[in-house]
């Protein structure tokens, strides 16, 4: 059976990174999307590759449509297909609960 090809948006930290780690060790190829967390995503890539996963990185600001549109074609070309898209990207801003 051929490796599953997965894209995870917002995968450098928190939930996205946890999702990627949960797939480590399975027969998968993963494209990790990130925007500002380059250091974190490179560390994650190394971790996943140590489990035998093939990993690709793409930086894109999803608030800019032209950058967002590049993710799927990039992943499709690198992984030679796409089986699953996990839309996890978000904006996370720490703030005091009383400010909501």
Outline where the language-model segments fall.
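Rossmann-fold scaffold of SDR-type NAD(P)-dependent oxidoreductases
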Residues: 9, 82-89
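Conserved mid-core segment of classical short-chain dehydrogenase/reductases
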Residues: 69, 92-100
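Rossmann-fold cofactor-recognition segment
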Residues: 48-64
């Amino acid at each position: 059976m051929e490796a599953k090809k997965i894209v995870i948006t917002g995968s450098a930290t928190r939930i996205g990174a946890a999702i990627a780690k949960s797939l480590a060790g399975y027969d998968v190829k993963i494209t990790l999307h990130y925007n500002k967390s380059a250091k974190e995503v490179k560390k994650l890539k190394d971790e996943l590759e140590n489990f035998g996963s093939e990993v690709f990185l793409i930086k894109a600001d999803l608030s800019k449509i032209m950058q967002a549109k590049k993710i799927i074609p990039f992943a499709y070309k690198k992984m030679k297909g796409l089986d699953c898209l996990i839309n996890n990207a978000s904006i996370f801003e720490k703030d005091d609960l009383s400010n909501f």
